[in-house]
Design a protein with these regions (language model features):
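Active-site catalytic loop in hydrolytic enzyme cores
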Residues: 82-158, 163, 167-176, 203, ...
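Short beta-strand scaffold segments in enzyme catalytic cores
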Residues: 76-78, 90-93, 126, 207-209, ...
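Generic N-terminal amphipathic, Lys/Arg-enriched alpha-helix
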Residues: 1-8
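CN hydrolase (nitrilase-like) catalytic-core segments centered on the catalytic cysteine
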Residues: 55-75, 144-227
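Short, acidic/polar
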Residues: 13-22, 144-150
Length: 254
């Protein structure tokens, strides 16, 4: 888990920091690396059209090279992605072969941080096969919408990745929602938040891994750090068998 501070609008500085922290994780044996939301720019939304990258841009190029060099899977947080017309808050998954395996455009844009003024929303959920098993991907504000993780769990998701830029003022929500999503959907949650501050917000950090029983297996501080966690994803099946909510649910009554 790459819990990093982000220099607002300074892509080169953020790329250098992300690379150093990824390499530190690899030295500690990481096979899967997760970055925070908008890790290469931060919420520099007034300049986001100038900062946005195509898929062949330098930020993803760096991550593709690192994934292949170290034989790791990277859940590449998110970056501002342009298709030439629109700009999206887009998370990518880069495989051990250095290729883009999937991407997810953030569905729920948060008005409190003016995303809806500068970005376009996505309209498709994201499920993929990960080294962590069947996985899903949401971004930050999406965490508040219970329907999306539930639909993903019903479709087979067993690990939910949540890159974020979550402010300290709502820090209690961050912890509570990550644990709740893990318990109610009986899946692992791997949530990576930034630290530091921008012009308007202090960011909470506390990146975490939560198991399907709601136990927090690891939790970061409010400082920059690389958090390496050994997770037995296969243990999720035993946890799910204890309280078989998906067997017992009665959606026809809801």
């Amino acid at each position: 888990l790459v819990q990093m501070d982000i220099v607002l609008g300074n892509v080169a500085a953020n790329q250098a920091k992300a690379q150093a922290m990824i390499e530190e994780g690899c030295r500690q044996g990481a096979r899967l690396v997760v970055l925070p939301e908008l890790w290469n720019t931060g919420y520099q939304l007034q300049e986001i059209r100038n900062l946005a990258e195509y898929e062949d841009g330098s930020s993803l190029g760096m991550l593709k090279r690192l994934a292949q060099e170290y034989c790791i899977e990277i859940v590449a947080g998110s970056i501002a992605e342009t298709d030439g017309t629109h700009v999206y808050n887009t998370a990518y998954v880069i495989g051990q072969d250095g290729g883009i395996h999937t991407k997810y455009r953030k569905i729920h844009l948060i008005g409190l941080m003016a995303e809806d003024r500068y970005l376009s929303p996505g309209n498709r959920r994201c499920l993929f096969d990960s080294v962590a098993g069947p996985a899903g991907l949401i971004i930050c504000y999406d965490l508040r919408f219970t329907e999306l993780p539930r639909a993903m769990a019903l479709a087979g998701c067993r690990t939910l990745f949540v890159p974020a830029e979550w402010p300290s003022v709502r820090g209690r929500h961050w912890v509570t929602l990550n644990v709740a999503r893990a318990i109610e959907n009986q899946l692992f949650v791997i949530a990576v938040n930034r630290v530091g501050k921008d012009l308007d917000n202090d960011f909470y950090g506390h990146s975490m891994v939560v198991d399907p029983w709601g136990e927090v297996l690891a939790e970061g501080s409010e400082k920059e750090e690389v958090i390496v966690v050994d997770v037995n994803f296969a243990a999720g099946e035993e946890i799910r068998s204890r309280i078989p909510v998906f067997r017992d649910r009665r959606p026809e009554c809801y």
